[in-house]
Amino acid sequence: MNKQDVMKLQTCVLKVNVHCEGCKHKVKKQLQKIEGVYSVKADVEQGRVTVTGNIDPALLVKKLSKSGKHAEILGGGGGGGGGGGKGFPNLNGQFANLNMGGNNKPKGGKESNQVKGKAGGGGGGGQNHGHGQPMQLNPQQIQQMMMMKAAHGGGGGGQMKMPPMAAKDQKKSVKFADDEDDEFSEDDYDDEDFSEDDYDDDEFDDDEDDDDEMGHGHGHGGGGGNHMPPNKMMMPNKMMPQMGGHHGNGGGPKGPNEIMMMMNGFKGGGGGGKKGGGGGFEIPVQMKGMGEGKNGKDGKKGKGGEKGKKEGKENKGGGKTGKTDAKSGGGGLLGFFKKGKSGNGDEKKSAGKKDGHGGNKVKSHGGGGGVQHYDSGPKKGGGGTKGGGHGGLDIDELMKHSKGGGGGGNKGNHNHSAKGIGGGPMGPGGPMGPGGPMGQGGPMGMMGPGGPMSMMGPGGPMGPMGGQGGSYPAVQGLPMSGGGGYYPGPPQASQQMNQQQYMQMMMNQQQQQQQQQQAVAHGGYGGGHGGDMYHPMMYARPYPAVNYAHPPPMPPPHSDSYTHMFSDENPGSCSIM
């Protein structure tokens, strides 16, 4: 076999009713006849036949059923060639789809959220949810792949390993919107894996909550939270777990707006969105004045916005939003607005399906925690939750016009990016995108410019640092000045840049003025008295009073010409130059 043939080989595992050596022999013979089959291995005990070659598994099944043997494709199918159980992708196609950057983001087909282990999904992206055996085909592994007995999902480039509970509720997530898959695939940032205690803060985490609430939230929103192994490469500076995952669009956001939350925000609670069962996306509001409101799980650490278990298990019952009795008086948003129990107390309007797209309105007031649950929990359209009020401030009115949190991106805030134009984590409608719950202009554009409550962004109605030049607030331990925040977003970036360049220009201008003035003062014009008429500009050094003698003029350049006469650097010494 030449190299190209090897590259085209696929392994397919068929479940065939093989009872004895005779059957086995017959099946082998049938399969060997098919063009493109390279080797056939039969396992009588398990009733499995492993076929290697450049063939279409559907063809194998067809041939076997003709000869009276019922066959099913177990693994290896799907992937290329359009999903389902059809056509093996050739490996080159897989390499294209594997996205070697380590994102585990199979591009190509819609991420198939099929519950059975039948690998679906196009372009090497079939995720065999049932068999959670990831298999990344590198060129070095091709030979091994040929030898493997049961290569589950030879085709699936990006099959993700899943915790056991993933498959049980997966049925709900078979709906997905096309546009989300390409750019922001939900696997990239899904944090379903945080139930594995990779990044949880153990003290705030109680596992019953996880177990009860996870599994209800898998990807019910716009695009189905597909699952991936904790992918540490994708974490900015490994500082924080992927935040969002479950809010419908999968994909915990990554980006300037949320990095602010890394240092403090995550004291509260567990790797992001994980506990917001039903795919809730909790944003710990407090950062600086963290007080006691640590968003603690069972109110263990002060009832920071989530008192005890969220009753209703995060709207398992649909319209009943999880009560987050945000009573805690501690903290206050960034220590700015301290208000123990907000006026509306625990007013939880269970606005169930009020928004028409199934958005819940969780008003968690309370200075202490104000955890906003962007629950696009079990609602299938990924409805955005109507941005409820946040801690301490009675901003219900402010929030009214930011309906439709970024949940599934289906009605992205402000941007109305209907149908999830950027349904992914950072797209216009996503949880962090320009219209999403925390993006620029989202209901709580926490750092983003222009949200109704954009705490820090320029121009928000309430932004304490609103207005020009206000950058993100400093993260704990950084200066709170204009450039203090991490990664200012583009709008601020431009202002910051302008400021800096402006400062730079001012400095240069001053230096030039200084030099000119010095030149003038040292006899530039009229020897003795020219300089005094030119008053120094901003910070130029003051000149002596008029009636004093001027300092001696600058010495002429190259007074000691011998030093340079034979130096390489003095072109004057050489007539040719």
Swiss-Prot record:
Residues 77-87, 118-129, 245-254, 266-281, 379-392, 420-451 have a biased composition (Gly residues). A lipid is attached at residue 574 (S-farnesyl cysteine). Residues 77-136, 150-451 are annotated as: Disordered. Residues 168-177, 294-326, 344-358 have a biased composition (Basic and acidic residues). The keyword Lipoprotein applies. The modification Cysteine methyl ester is found at residue 574. Pfam families: HMA. InterPro entries: HMA_dom, HMA_dom_sf. Heavy-metal-binding protein. This is Heavy metal-associated isoprenylated plant protein 34. It comes from Arabidopsis thaliana. The lineage of its organism: Eukaryota, Viridiplantae, Streptophyta, Embryophyta, Tracheophyta. The gene is HIPP34.
